[in-house]
Amino acid sequence: MKLCLRCSILVISTLLFVVPGIVSASWQPEITVGICQGVAEAEFSGRNAPLYVYTDEQQKSPLLTIPQQEKLRVRFLHNTFELNGKTYEAKQLYIQAGEYESIYINDMPYRGYITLLKQNGMTVINHVLTEDYLYGVVPKEMPSTWPMGALRAQSIAARTFALKNRNRHNEQGFDLCNTAHCQVYEGSSAETKETTVAVDRTRGEVMFYHGAIIDAVFHTDSGGMTESAEQVWGSYVPYLRAVSELQTKTKPWTQRVSTALFVKKMEESGKKIGRMKSIHLSPLSIGKGSKDRSPSGRVQFIEVLGDKGNCVVSGSDLRRLFALPSTLFDVQRESSDIVFRGYGRGHGLGLSQWGAKAFADRGKTDREILSHYYTDITIEKIY
């Protein structure tokens, strides 16, 4: 068997430090995406072509051929694969349709081909070329109705993030997962005309800082000002600096938590305060720091006073404990509740998607948008 994507793979180190312009225009890297992990069964089909199942990438004849429109039901039983009721001994399986044909996984179409691994159950992995991968990512990360400048900026950011973070899930046997932990990916069922055009018009374009591909993290909405990396990750990153938006205090949100639940969460975190007496936090002013806020205004910590003790809780811990949209908030006690009122959604690093839309609405190009959010970067076409 000759899998059609294999000719596109280069060693990962070549992606992290690239001299633009020397890579063949026909080359592009392959991404492996974890679609399902630890499952007991899955279903596959080829709507317009047969499916071919192999036990080895170099195998010339398939182990099994599934006619088009018919289902391949794979079950993982007692550390073996059962294919349509028959057991096969194999370390892993490869499933391929005809070239340029999609494979349906549980009735959802995916480009490329599939690997099945034994790993605490069965892991389903989609092998897909970078540009095909982006066709299924960009429409899930940004609405296709948004301006082309924003869609193009998102395409470049998503491509850069994917290439920088290949092998993020190496221990699980693939590069990236299909959730917001990496990038949301739903295969070809997600594709739209507008986002495909945005990907195609930026083909191979990647962001660099001093010759190295950047970690192009992005988020939904900064609330008025993005954040610097050291305030979130604890380490300085030269291209991830706090920058202002065209608009402040966008998309306000409110979240209420009962005082009883708040105290319970504190105790579960090892902070014994007893009956709550008060909460101390400087008032929010976007773009203005204080002893308990970063220079962008995000909460670094709050002080909680109780009749049995006091404690300090970080903004990131509060966001995690109470599923807050961001750390750009005020907090007050109201009757028997603790009320968080804030702005923005996400960690605040890098590209703000709503901010990108605002810039694109005013006619800014993808490069102008990206240069605003990622300091001193260059954008190069590597294939």
Task: Specify the residue positions occupied by each region the protein language model found.
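Conserved, single-site charged/polar hotspot
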Residues: 2-383
